[in-house]
C-alpha cells in the first residue's frame, strides 16, 4: 500500500530482508513505518517465544539497527517521520500478538530493544539532538513541534545509554536543559529523559518541577 495513513492490518508474505529493504529505502512513508513496526514486533515475538534472556542476549538484529541508522541520517526525511519510525511498538500491541502473555517479560524485552537502539546509535542520537534543538522563542508550528519531539527522543536515548555505561554527561545535560527550558514541552522532555533513564539526577529535576508548579491548579 502507498500513500496510506489510516489504521489497517496487512497480511504480507515478505521476507525479513525485504522488510529491511523497505525500511531503509522505500520512498513511501507508510511502507517505511509499517516495515519498521513489523520487524520490531517479529523480533520481540521471536525472542519471547524462544524464551531468551533480554539481559544477556540482543533482541534486534544488525540489519534492523543499520536501517534505523539510515533513517536517522537521511537528510530528506522530516523530524516528525523519523520520530514516528524510531518509536517501538507498544507493549500492548506486542502482547496482542501473543497466545499467552507475561506482562513483565514483554516489558523487559521492549526495554531491552530501547536500550539496544540507544547504545547502537549513540553517534546518530547525539547528532540528531543537536540538529533538532529549537532555540529562541517558542513556536507551536508543525516543524518546530516535530523537532522538539525528535530531540526529546534523542535525549532520552542518550540518557539511557549513559546510565547503562555508568556516565553522567548526558543526564547532566538533560538537567541543564530542564533548567534552561522556556516552554513546558522542552522542560517535560528533559524531565522524562531523566526519569526514564533512572539516573539519580531525576530526583533533583522532579523536586524542581514540584517547586515550580506546586501552586498551579
Segments and roles (model prediction):
Residues 1-217:
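Long, ordered, helix-rich scaffold segments
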